[in-house]
A protein has these predicted regions:
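Acidic, Ser/Pro/Thr-rich low-complexity regulatory regions
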Residues: 1-106
Length: 106
């Protein structure tokens, strides 16, 4: 599966909250759930080997969970052939998951 057009958002707590809010409300989001998951992964990777401040450190487990759940959702929903050939730009994880992640940030 090839990557999406990257979401153009800075790697900040406010952006993470905004991205998760868009995930919970995909009809009003400029980004797909795939783009949101990929953005979460890039955010996490940026701080992988860096001592980030506490605000960022507290976000990282949630961001990792978003990306991991995206992968698991696809693997548990689609065949290997579909995973290799489809782009999943229109696929959506359950909105409730995004609401749960947002509640963990509160």
């Amino acid at each position: 599966m090839k990557p999406s057009r990257p979401a153009d958002m800075p790697f900040t707590r406010a952006s993470a909250v905004r991205m998760l809010t868009w995930g919970a409300n995909p009809d009003s989001s400029p980004y797909s759930h795939k783009q949101i998951a990929e953005w979460c992964d890039r955010f996490w990777c940026k701080y992988l080997e860096v001592d980030a401040d506490a605000e960022i450190e507290n976000l990282l487990p949630i961001l990792t969970h978003v990306e991991t759940q995206w992968d698991l959702y696809l693997v548990n929903t689609y065949s290997i052939e579909a995973l290799q050939t489809q782009d999943f730009e229109q696929e959506q994880m359950p909105k409730e998951w995004f609401n749960e992640w947002l509640s963990q940030l509160a």
